[in-house]
């Protein structure tokens, strides 16, 4: 066969991080079928969909079962009823004004952050914080922007911005000119946040260097500390240089239901090969119209329900449940004498392995000796080596049990 493969796929690490974790866990479970594993690795939720969400879902399905209210293909960008509620509830309280045409409903922030790079030329220089959510890097490797990976674990054409304990997990601005910057706050995996003053430095950099910020705000609903920005658009000038991604996965338990959105302000312009300004919003709209048929009507009605008074109350109860879990994890690990980060305005807890044990080795220790599944920090990039991530998304009972098991280990 003469068909040629996309050669850039050969540059990707063999297994996606969470696929490798699942492989190791499945292998161990088969060998030890009686082991009661507590999974605190992948960021999947355990609380069921809120009652108001389920009811809205059912009503929408019933509509599709009636000839008078049946709907076929929906708008690729999303139904106005959900877009308008997004603007009214998620942005207006922050003082951010948006148009319907600037909000795009999708089936996940992972899809959006992975797909958005398709709009840009292969020769753009991207920058990522390190450690980093793997999708940002892998999608650019697939597109041919990364170059080869060196022995140090870094791709040669990607600019890495270390976020470590030495800089309080606040990466420095790039020392060189970059074109596209991926930021995620509250951060995955470290669970840390930026102040408005710190985020403004990134917006200023983007203005000064004609750069674009791709801002992943999937975990903003966990922010409790006053003054921490929930959106990059709270920063003056950000609508000229940023795109924002959000998700209903964690805030409303939609990990299996699939619904999210991104905001592409009409003020954002990029340049073509001749240096002419090109508006970004229509490009994303064109991409979605070609490659995406939209989120189903029942799912969008279900998502809309979280903005009702009852829905907001139910969603907050679930968020509070996970926040309590995060507090249990953080306090328990600190009592063990471990260095712990995150878990305050985030569902993720990032902690230093004891005695400088490498990430995958400590992952195996927790798996085999405590029957707790974690995520090794090295899977998020070289600066993640020597750390592990735990999530607050299991049940409260399992969370307490997991901490008790870990506390009994001899490091």
UniProtKB/Swiss-Prot annotation:
Catalytic activity: (2S,6S)-2,6-diaminopimelate + 2-oxoglutarate = (S)-2,3,4,5-tetrahydrodipicolinate + L-glutamate + H2O + H(+)
Keyword Transferase: yes
EC number(s) reported in the record: 2.6.1.83
Binding site for substrate: 16, 43, 110, 133, 188, 293, 389
UniProt key word Plastid: no
Primary enzyme class: transferase
Known cofactor(s): pyridoxal 5'-phosphate
InterPro entries the record matches: Aminotransferase_I/II_large, DapL/ALD1, PyrdxlP-dep_Trfase, PyrdxlP-dep_Trfase_major, PyrdxlP-dep_Trfase_small
Pfam family, one: Aminotran_1_2
Keywords: Aminotransferase, Pyridoxal phosphate, Transferase
Residues that coordinate or bind pyridoxal 5'-phosphate: 73, 109-110, 133, 188, 219, 247-249, 258, 293
Biological pathway: Amino-acid biosynthesis; L-lysine biosynthesis via DAP pathway; LL-2,6-diaminopimelate from (S)-tetrahydrodipicolinate (aminotransferase route): step 1/1
GO process terms (BP): lysine biosynthetic process via diaminopimelate, diaminopimelate-aminotransferase pathway
A molecular function (GO) term: L,L-diaminopimelate aminotransferase activity
Protein family: Belongs to the class-I pyridoxal-phosphate-dependent aminotransferase family. LL-diaminopimelate aminotransferase subfamily.
Assembly behavior: Homodimer.
UniProt cross-references to NCBIfam families, sorted A to Z: DAPAT_plant
Role played: Involved in the synthesis of meso-diaminopimelate (m-DAP or DL-DAP), required for both lysine and peptidoglycan biosynthesis. Catalyzes the direct conversion of tetrahydrodipicolinate to LL-diaminopimelate.
PANTHER family hit by this protein: AMINOTRANSFERASE
Record protein name field: LL-diaminopimelate aminotransferase
Organism: Methanosphaera stadtmanae (strain ATCC 43021 / DSM 3091 / JCM 11832 / MCB-3)
